[in-house]
Curated annotation (Swiss-Prot):
Keyword terms, alphabetized: Cell inner membrane, Cell membrane, Membrane, Signal, Transport
Basic and acidic residues bias spans: 399-415
Principal subcellular localisation of the protein: membrane
Signal keyword on record: yes
The protein's name in its UniProt record: Multidrug resistance protein MdtA
Compositionally biased residues, Polar residues: 31-47
NCBIfam families per the UniProt record, alphabetical: PRK11556.1, RND_mfp
Subunit structure: Part of a tripartite efflux system composed of MdtA, MdtB and MdtC.
Up-regulation conditions: The mdtABC operon is transcriptionally activated by BaeR.
Signal peptide positions on this chain: 1-21
Length: 415
C-alpha cells in the first residue's frame, strides 16, 4: 500500500517537471522567432559582411604629411649677449664745479654734442694771464731785435765789439724761445677752458647721470659724469662649438657675408638680422667653444646692450632636399624610421637617414622620396601593414572624430 502511494507521487512530480519544461521550450521559441527579422537586418547592414553578431574594428585615425623637395638653409646656433659697439664713460679732464648738464637720461646724442659744463672762471683767468705774458714777451722780442739791428750797423764801423753783438744776438734768440713757451702756455690755458665744456666723444645713447649739478668734480673721478653706449650699430657676441670652426671658415672663404639672426629668449621671435664680423683668435679650453661677433645696424633699437638672445648663423643652403615634419621622425632599436602610407592607406616602416633638423622639419637623406606620405600623428599603435584612416589636421576635433578616437582607444586598451 505504501509502495503504490510513493509511486503515484513520483509520477505526479515527473508530469509537473515535463509541463514546466514544455512551457519554457515554447516560450524561448517564440522569442527567437520575434527577434529573427531584426538580427537578419543587422547582419545585412554589417560593413564587413561577416558572421552574425561580429562587429568590424574601427580604423586607427592618423594625420599625414607629404614629403617635399625644397632648399633647406643650414644654421649654426648659439647663445649670446648683445654688446655695445663702443662704451664710453664720460669724465671731466679738468677740476672744478659742475655748472650744467645738457642731456636727458636715455637720450641719443651725436659725437660733439655738449653734455656738461664746468665752471670756466679759473680757466678764463689762466688764459688771460698766459695771453698777457705772451704780449709782454713779444714786445721784449721786438725791442731786442731793434737793438740787434743797431748793433749790426755799429759793428761794421767797429763802434761795438764782437762780444756785444753776440750777446745781443743771444738775447734775441732767448726771447724768441720765451715767446714759444708763452704761446704754449696760451694754448694750454685755451685747452683747459675748452675742456670745461664736456662733449660726447661718440654717437650713442646716454645712460643715467652719475653726478648732479653743483658738485665738485675732478679728472680723477672713476665714476664719471655719464656712460654712453653706441647702439647704432650694435654687436652680438655668442659662442659656437670648436667643431663648427671649420664650417665657418669655409663659408667665409666663399666671399659672401654670413647672415646672423638674433632671436628672443624663447626662440620664437626674430629680433634683428646682421652679418658676421669676426671670430676670436683662440678657443676657450674650459668649454671647448669659440667666441663669435656679429654686427647689426639696429636702427629700430630692437637690440639692447647686455640683452640675452639666441643666435642663428646661416652657413649653407642644401638644395633639393627631401623634407618632412619633425613629428614624423621616430627612433627605435633599428635606428630612425618613419611610417609611410601607400595608396590603400596601409602603413609600412621605413628606416631613414636624417640630416638637418629643427623643431618643425627634418631633412631625410635616405629612406624615402619626395611625394611619399608619412604619418605625423597617431603613431603609437601602428603595426606593419595596418590600414588606417587619414584625418585632416583641425584646430577643433569634431564630435564624430572624438567618438571614433574614444572607440579606438577602448579597443586598444582591451587588446
Amino acid at each position: 500500500m505504501k509502495g503504490s502511494y510513493k509511486s503515484r507521487w513520483v509520477i505526479v512530480i515527473v508530469v509537473v517537471i515535463a509541463a514546466i519544461a514544455a512551457f519554457w521550450f515554447w516560450q524561448g521559441r517564440n522569442d527567437s522567432q520575434s527577434a529573427a527579422p531584426g538580427a537578419t537586418k543587422q547582419a545585412q547592414q554589417s560593413p564587413a559582411g561577416g558572421r552574425r553578431g561580429m562587429r568590424a574594428d574601427p580604423l586607427a585615425p592618423v594625420q599625414a604629411a607629404t614629403a617635399v623637395e625644397q632648399a633647406v638653409p643650414r644654421y649654426l646656433t648659439g647663445l649670446g649677449t648683445i654688446t655695445a659697439a663702443n662704451t664710453v664713460t664720460v669724465r671731466s679732464r679738468v677740476d672744478g664745479q659742475l655748472m650744467a648738464l645738457h642731456f636727458q637720461e636715455g637720450q641719443q646724442v651725436k659725437a660733439g654734442d655738449l653734455l656738461a659744463e664746468i665752471d670756466p672762471s679759473q680757466f678764463k683767468v689762466a688764459l688771460a694771464q698766459a695771453q698777457g705774458q705772451l704780449a709782454k714777451d713779444k714786445a721784449t722780442l721786438a725791442n731786442a731785435r731793434r737793438d740787434l739791428a743797431r748793433y749790426q750797423q755799429l759793428a761794421k764801423t767797429n763802434l761795438v765789439s764782437r762780444q756785444e753783438l753776440d750777446a745781443q744776438q743771444a738775447l734775441v734768440s732767448e726771447t724768441e724761445g720765451t715767446i714759444k713757451a708763452d704761446e704754449a702756455s696760451v694754448a694750454s690755458a685755451q685747452l683747459q677752458l675748452d675742456w670745461s665744456r664736456i662733449t660726447a666723444p661718440v654717437d650713442g645713447r646716454v645712460g643715467l647721470k652719475q653726478v648732479d649739478v653743483g658738485n665738485q668734480i675732478s679728472s680723477g673721478d672713476t665714476t664719471g659724469i655719464v656712460v654712453i653706449t653706441q647702439t647704432h650699430p650694435i654687436d652680438l657676441v655668442f659662442t659656437l662649438p670648436e667643431s663648427d670652426i671649420a664650417t665657418v671658415v669655409q663659408a667665409q672663404k666663399a666671399g659672401k657675408p654670413l647672415v646672423v639672426e638674433a632671436w628672443d629668449r624663447t626662440n620664437s621671435k626674430k629680433l634683428s638680422e646682421g652679418t658676421l664680423l669676426s671670430l676670436d683668435n683662440q678657443i676657450d679650453a674650459t668649454t671647448g667653444t669659440i667666441k663669435v661677433k656679429a654686427r647689426f645696424n639696429n636702427q629700430d633699437d630692437a637690440l639692447f646692450p647686455n640683452q640675452f638672445v639666441n643666435a642663428r648663423m646661416l652657413v649653407d643652403t642644401e638644395q633639393n632636399a627631401v623634407v618632412i615634419p619633425t613629428a614624423a621622425l621616430q627612433m627605435g632599436n633599428e635606428g630612425h624610421f618613419v611610417w609611410v602610407l601607400n595608396s590603400e592607406n596601409k602603413v609600412s616602416k621605413h628606416l631613414v637617414t636624417p640630416g638637418i633638423q629643427d623643431s618643425q622639419k627634418v631633412v631625410i637623406r635616405a629612406g624615402i622620396s619626395a611625394g611619399d606620405r608619412v604619418v605625423t600623428d597617431g603613431i603609437d599603435r601602428l603595426t606593419e601593414g595596418a590600414k588606417v584612416e587619414v584625418v585632416e589636421t583641425q584646430s577643433a576635433t569634431t564630435p564624430e572624430e572624438k567618438a571614433t578616437s574614444r572607440e579606438y582607444a577602448k579597443k586598444g586598451a582591451r587588446s
